[in-house]
Amino acid sequence: MSEVEYRCFVGGLAWATNDEDLQRTFSQFGDVIDSKIINDRESGRSRGFGFVTFKDEKAMRDAIEEMNGKELDGRVITVNEAQSRGSGGGGGGRGGSGGGYRSGGGGGYSGGGGGGYSGGGGGGYERRSGGYGSGGGGGGRGYGGGGRREGGGYGGGDGGSYGGGGGGW
């Protein structure tokens, strides 16, 4: 798909928030082409994040500016630019820095910055400051994070998750 998509990643959503709620909330910034909450394949329950696709870039930028860190359905949400699925490492998608699965920057599962499971910075299980078995301040990005035995993961050096030097179990 060569066409540019103006899509936002939205993380930290309440379980009760649905596609229509996203559409309604974000349509104040411009024409919403699509809004989708990602559900767990097995349980069918919301995974706490989704995507909103806008018709134009200005609407997307305005939504990111206005909604990131704001409250929706009683939860503070993370909103940032989602990268196209094909872009790979540099800019986002899986394993990149923008949004979406395993993002480095903003939210989602294994997110480095925003919430999400195994998040390095803010929120989620095994985060740096709080969560299951975390060291409360040192490296630690969940299992084996931060370059094994050097600040995270099993037996980590300073403040990682399980068995980290600065705390943990």
UniProtKB/Swiss-Prot annotation:
Residues that bear ADP-ribosylarginine: 47
Compartments, as annotated in UniProt: Cytoplasm; Nucleus; Secreted
Post-translational modification: ADP-ribosylated by the Pseudomonas syringae type III effector HopU1. ADP-ribosylation reduces the ability of the protein to bind RNA.
Lineage, highest ranks first: Eukaryota, Viridiplantae, Streptophyta, Embryophyta, Tracheophyta
SUPFAM superfamilies: RNA-binding domain, RBD (SSF54928)
Protein name: Glycine-rich RNA-binding protein 8
Example of a GO biological process term: response to cold
Domain of life: Eukaryota
